[in-house]
């Protein structure tokens, strides 16, 4: 990744960084909740971004 990034690329990287986290524990405790983990987790070395 270049040191000089365009603002659009920087925004996409920031969004991907925020999305790459586990589910909050309080969300798992909600009634009738079937979601157990974040299926869209991304590892920085295994799966690269398309942006």
Curated annotation (Swiss-Prot):
A biological-process GO annotation: translation
GO CC aspect terms: cytosolic large ribosomal subunit
InterPro entries recorded: Ribosomal_eL39 (IPR000077), Ribosomal_eL39_CS (IPR020083), Ribosomal_eL39_dom_sf (IPR023626)
GO MF annotation, one: structural constituent of ribosome
Flavoprotein is among the record's keywords: no
The keyword rRNA processing belongs to this UniProt entry's keyword annotation: no
Quaternary structure note: Interacts with YIH1.
Protein name (record): Large ribosomal subunit protein eL39
Organism of derivation: Kluyveromyces marxianus (Yeast)
Gene: RPL39
